[in-house]
UniProtKB/Swiss-Prot annotation:
Cofactors, names only: Zn(2+)
GO CC field: cytosol
Record keywords: Aminoacyl-tRNA synthetase, ATP-binding, Cytoplasm, Ligase, Metal-binding, Nucleotide-binding, Protein biosynthesis, Zinc
Cofactor: how bound: Binds 1 zinc ion per subunit.
Annotated source species: Acinetobacter baylyi (strain ATCC 33305 / BD413 / ADP1)
Protein name: Cysteine--tRNA ligase
Amino acid sequence: MQPFVLYNSEQRKKVEFVPRKPGHIDMYVCGMTVYDYCHIGHARVMVAFDYIIRFLRSQGWDVRYIRNITDIDDKIIKRANENNETIQQLTSRFIDAMNEDAAKLGCAEPDEAPKATEYIGEMQNMISTLVDKGSAYPASNGDVYFEVSKFEKYGRLSGRKLEDMQAGASERVDIEVEKKHPFDFVLWKGAKPNEPSWVSPWGNGRPGWHIECSAMSTCCLGNHFDIHGGGSDLTFPHHENEIAQSEASTGEQYVNYWMHVGFINVDGEKMSKSLGNFFTIRDVMEKFHPEVIRYFIVSSHYRSPVNFSDVALKEAKTALTRFYHAFKAYEQVYGQNDSTQKDEQFIERFNIAMRDDFNTPEAIAVLFELNRELNRAVKEQQAEQAAIYYVTLRHLTQILGLVQHDVDEFLKSDIGQEVLSLSDDEIQAMIQQRADAKKAKDFSGADAIRQALLDQGVVLEDTRQGTLWRRAD
């Protein structure tokens, strides 16, 4: 196992990771509330932790990765009623859609994906413990609240002081007259007519949002585990409340390291459903190849805000295509190479970047340098060196989950573009006609064929190994 540094949101600085168990990392990431299709902000969280875990495993770490599913929630109930379907029908459909989207983005499945409704008993046990310890109290309306003033360290993750906060800091926190203090948050919601509920010591009801993650994470990973992650928007109140209720319940430190993925912005504003400026993953995949979306996410540091636009995705497509072109040029001459010999200097430079808080922009810069060296070696017919560069680049791009598709299929992908009026055979025939024209020194005729293909959306690229074609951007 190689040591690495990560930014701990609680300490507000980069620190060296020290595992609780040698060689092992327990990680919990807040997943989706499944009442709609995932948007591009969800994609960023899924992809970021996917490449982080891929890298850690490549470094010899044994990672146990848990990502939960919230399948009971006010929004889920509302949407199911609007659709005139059961909650189970709604959530099952969107869980399937979420998994399909994640797979297309190249994300491996988590080791476990617990659903909130499967842990109701564990949530009730945690709430009972909090009530018994005096950290929570039942209200007359059937709700149970966590008493924030009883937890002295409240605010340590977000850096907020209790006295400075305002009630209703999040749309997910209700202001109720039954609270002792306006910042107290609900652990158990008393049953309402025509809503799902479970029997409990406090009457029929259902869990609050925050208690779900505390119960699922501690049941899957234990009271005290290594890394908890999620989107930056969850820092407060969700993660702050998780810390309070978990530590008040168990008496142990909840998490050693907190990791938060930055916002995706649209026109300078955070992308969110509440602002109505969000794009579903499926919306974007209609216009761009899923791996282009993944590259767009990987190319920015996971903590940095990133601006979403068609221009940015087109730039991502152009950049990703450079790797595919390099592989195509090599494979046309030498075929696919499964050698194990790699360039250790490039690998170490890549690893150094990734060990520094998963610095993907720096890591990708190393990959582009390696890509240039591969192109040079192929051009200069340095077969042995080209093979080493090829195998090394294949290895490192795989760690980031990039360049994982068939080269020709990717280069000729028509996602988001009009269907070509020419077949592959017709394009190849025109390429041959152009080659014949050049051989006959009919350069104007050759140029005319190139332009005719370009007018049809086909770009030709002449290489030492022959002429390649791809779709125009």
